[in-house]
Design a protein with these regions (language model features):
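Short, Lys/Arg-enriched N-terminal segments with co-localized hydrophobic residues
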Residues: 1-3
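Bacterial Sec-dependent N-terminal signal peptides
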Residues: 5-7
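Bacterial N-terminal signal peptides
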Residues: 11-20
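Sec/Tat signal peptide C-region and signal peptidase I cleavage site
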Residues: 24-26
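Residue-level detector of conserved, function-critical positions
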Residues: 28-307
Length: 307
């Protein structure tokens, strides 16, 4: 029932019976938790000093499913900061939160608010990423034709002119030039996103300037170690390697797959005799320190791994 759902969500907030700091997540005190629990239907743990609340809705714990209701925010003392007025909302981060409101045609349109509740980016975007490196990636258009812009916390918006743009990760965002192709649906079920992007990828800085030219057939985000897996189309499939933030190829694109480095090792795979995939490990120079020979493998953690 709803009380049980609320209790399970609040259990994180009441852990250790006080205010808890875990990164940017702050759990409110048990007294505040009880007051908020009595006032709202769903209460999330505090993030960036503010607590997301919902009135008139419910959420299934450990899932992304949620009801309509209205979203707002309270502080860690339980005082209302932003009254519940939005149809969708994310947690605060870097002093701002993405909020959404249904338009007359049923579309959810998103914007950005600051800690006082002031709208700094108007609610007119079909997707809006959280603030990273001082900007957020905004998207409008249709599923098959998307337009991307960068919006900063002062409300300035810059059109990018790319067909694809990811959120920023460790200072850079992936951009692409190409087209959206409808996914093949052999099962006859409704796909959450029926289109996928096909084209070439590069990377931009938070000011929108190109850092690594659009040239790769596939690419992933930069990790904290300053490396990103990138792919180049081979004769039969995309081959993967790694680049650094200057675009320098530090590991040649020789592998069927490549995971991000954990420490000084990364899991890679190759196609071997009979078309079988074999997994192994490389160092940061691309040398196979453990040859590709396993049916599966995981990244090194605490000097050990499983294969």
């Amino acid at each position: 029932n709803r009380h049980m759902i609320k209790h399970r969500i609040m259990s994180v907030a009441t852990l250790l019976g006080g205010v808890i700091f875990t990164g940017h997540v702050v759990a409110q005190s048990p007294e505040v938790a009880r007051r908020l629990d009595a006032k709202y239907d769903v209460v999330w743990p505090a993030v960036d000093g503010l607590i997301r609340v919902n009135k008139g809705g419910y959420r299934i714990p450990d899932s992304r499913m949620k009801s309509n209701g209205k979203y707002g925010y309270a502080d860690t003392l339980g005082q209302v900061v932003v009254p519940p007025a939005y149809d969708d909302a994310a947690d605060f981060g870097n002093g701002h939160a993405v909020v959404g409101r249904k338009a007359g045609d049923g579309r959810m349109l998103y914007g950005l608010i600051d800690r006082s509740g002031r709208v700094v980016v108007p609610l007119e975007w079909e997707r809006l990423g959280g603030v990273r490196n001082g900007v957020c990636v905004a998207r409008t258009g249709t599923a098959a034709k998307r337009e991307f812009s960068l919006a900063d916390t002062l409300g300035n918006v810059r059109s990018l002119g790319y067909d694809y743009c990811s959120d920023f990760s460790n200072g850079l965002a992936r951009v692409g030039v190409g087209a959206y192709v409808e996914k093949e649906n052999v099962a006859g079920i409704t796909l959450r996103d029926a289109y996928e992007f096909c084209g070439k990828f590069g990377y931009i800085a938070p000011d929108g300037g190109i850092v690594i030219p659009v040239q790769f057939d596939d690419a992933r985000d930069f990790a904290q170690d300053g490396l990103a897996p990138v792919g180049i189309q081979g004769k039969y499939y995309v081959k993967w390697g790694f680049i650094d933030k200057s675009g320098r190829q530090v590991v040649p694109c020789n592998f069927y797959s490549a995971e991000e480095f954990l420490g000084d090792r990364a899991v890679v795979s190759k196609v071997v005799a009979g078309g079988k995939l074999a997994y192994g490990y490389i160092d940061r120079s691309g040398k196979e320190v453990i040859p590709c020979q396993f049916d599966m493998a995981s990244g090194f953690r605490f000097a050990n791994t499983w294969v």
